[in-house]
Amino acid sequence: MSIHQESLIAAPTQQVFELLTSGSLFSAATGMPAEITDREGDAFSVFGGRVEGRQIELVPGQRVVQAWRFGAAHPSPWEPGVYSTVRFALAPSDQGTRLVIDHTGIPAEWIEHISQGYPTFYQDPLTKFFSN
């Protein structure tokens, strides 16, 4: 199962990329603990460990690809070894950055929950962070 969502963020693509690959910036935007690096292969943890995974592909100013799962701190963590793949594609637009989220390999029972969560936990906080 998969999710596709798009939004506009009022910031250059490089700034959005930096936020998605920096624990301190991501935490500042979301208000929740985050451990993220800008190195491919590194593990990450966001939202206080509710979501965790690994940085698969990082292309500055263009895209972030992650192996993604609900972690041990989530009320309903995924089974060990179960991961989905999320791709955050960044494209320049007149308003700043078009953020395209493609999330694949999601267990069917989680599609609606995750789809509804992206605006709350990603798009809205990023939009607010860059509007200040």
Region locations from a protein language model:
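Hydrophobic beta-strand positions in extracellular immunoglobulin-like domains
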Residues: I9, H103-G105
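Residues that scaffold the ATP/ADP-binding catalytic core of kinase and kinase-like folds
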Residues: L19, A29, A67, E109, ...
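Short, conserved loop/turn and helix-capping segments at secondary-structure boundaries
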Residues: L20, P80-G81, S115-Q116, T120
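Hydrophobic-ligand binding "helix-grip"
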Residues: S27-G31, E35-D38, S45, G49-G96, ...
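A conserved amphipathic terminal alpha-helix motif
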Residues: G105-N132
